[in-house]
């Protein structure tokens, strides 16, 4: 038996969506940005995984922690730092903010890009990937992003033991109604090295984590 990590909602839509978007332009790519939105629930197992992230070593804060050795340029490291960006994205017709799984997804996509380059099929010289949440209003982007920052601070502190007991436990999950009414969408903005830009999207019906 093999365990294949990062093959669910985190991080397949980001990884496959980036690969697909780049293939559509079929030329060297400078940058891909994705803006994710979704509706659904969280199981106790997922919440337990999120809370366990508070134990991760400082090395996990490295945007290229999953990359093979010597596959990161100075330009890539400068342009790929985790950041809070609240702005109107006209191509997506959404406001950007922090994405719930962006810390995990960005590392996976950057690793895939590095492996493609090692296989003599690079996405582009100094390729940069960034991920954000997509929100309907500036207020939603600000308050959700602040809520996520607060959540990350809690799971890194002793307070997490107090908060954890009030959330779903392992074995518990979203109801059938929540799973049926769920959905997800990712909007990818791809910029080629020659300046051409293209917008692609990936979407699905049903809870992205459990259907």
Give the ranges of each region predicted by the language model.
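Beta-strand-loop-alpha-helix segment that lines the small-molecule cofactor/substrate pocket
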Residues: 1-5
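Gly/Ser/Thr-rich loops at beta-strand to alpha-helix junctions
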Residues: 8-14, 39-40
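Active-site-proximal alpha-helical scaffold in enzymes
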Residues: 14-24
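C-terminal catalytic/substrate-binding lobe primarily of soluble NAD(P)-dependent oxidoreductases
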Residues: 22-211
């Amino acid at each position: 038996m093999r365990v294949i990590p990062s093959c669910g909602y985190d991080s397949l839509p980001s990884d496959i969506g980036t690969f697909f978007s780049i293939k559509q332009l079929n030329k060297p790519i400078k940058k891909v940005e994705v803006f994710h939105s979704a509706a659904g629930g969280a199981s106790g197992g997922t919440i337990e995984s999120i809370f366990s992230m508070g134990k991760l070593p400082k090395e996990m804060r490295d945007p290229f922690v999953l990359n093979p050795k010597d596959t990161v340029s100075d330009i890539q490291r400068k342009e790929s730092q985790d950041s809070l960006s609240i702005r109107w994205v006209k191509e997506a017709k959404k406001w950007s903010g922090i994405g719930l799984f962006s810390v995990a997804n960005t590392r996976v996509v950057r690793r895939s890009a590095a492996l493609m380059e090692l296989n003599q099929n690079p996405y582009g010289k100094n390729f940069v990937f960034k991920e954000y949440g997509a929100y309907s209003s500036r207020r939603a982007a600000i308050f959700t992003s602040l809520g996520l920052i607060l959540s990350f601070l809690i799971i890194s502190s002793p307070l997490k033991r107090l908060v954890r007991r009030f959330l779903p436990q392992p074995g518990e999950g979203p109801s059938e109604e929540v799973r049926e009414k769920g959905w997800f969408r990712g909007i990818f903005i791809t910029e080629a090295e020659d300046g051409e830009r293209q917008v692609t999207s990936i979407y699905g019906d049903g809870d992205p984590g459990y259907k």
